[in-house]
């Protein structure tokens, strides 16, 4: 179920405050955040966020195509090591 249009996008207040401060100053420093649930809004474009994946902070540079998605979508939490192609070599 999607979020109601009348409610608007959810962005953590502390994260929005940091973005507004940087936009006012005209700087684009990396913003470290644990808020994977925050939706990317148009004023986030051009900023780099360090999104926490449970172990480390993954840098995410926001572009126009990311607007409407959540920050957590661009910082995967699970690492896929890959499937073993042929198990016969390891059995020897």
From Swiss-Prot:
The gene is rpsS. One of its GO terms (cellular component) is small ribosomal subunit. This is Small ribosomal subunit protein uS19. InterPro entries: Ribosomal_uS19 (IPR002222), Ribosomal_uS19_bac-type (IPR005732), Ribosomal_uS19_CS (IPR020934), Ribosomal_uS19_SF (IPR023575). The lineage of its organism: Bacteria, Bacillati, Actinomycetota, Actinomycetes, Bifidobacteriales. GO terms for molecular function: rRNA binding; structural constituent of ribosome. GO terms for biological process: ribosomal small subunit assembly; translation. Protein S19 forms a complex with S13 that binds strongly to the 16S ribosomal RNA. Belongs to the universal ribosomal protein uS19 family. Keywords: Ribonucleoprotein, Ribosomal protein, RNA-binding, rRNA-binding. Signal peptide: none annotated. It comes from the Bacteria. Gene3D superfamilies: 30s Ribosomal Protein S19, Chain A.
């Amino acid at each position: 179920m999607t979020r109601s249009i009348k409610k608007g996008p959810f962005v953590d207040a502390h994260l929005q405050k940091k973005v507004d401060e940087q936009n006012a100053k005209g700087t684009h420093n990396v913003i470290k955040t644990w808020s994977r649930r925050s939706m990317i809004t148009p004023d986030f474009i051009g900023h780099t966020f360090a999104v926490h994946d449970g172990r480390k902070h993954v840098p995410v540079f926001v572009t126009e195509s990311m607007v409407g998605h959540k920050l957590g979508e661009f910082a995967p939490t699970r690492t896929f090591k890959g499937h073993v192609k042929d198990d016969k070599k390891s059995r020897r």
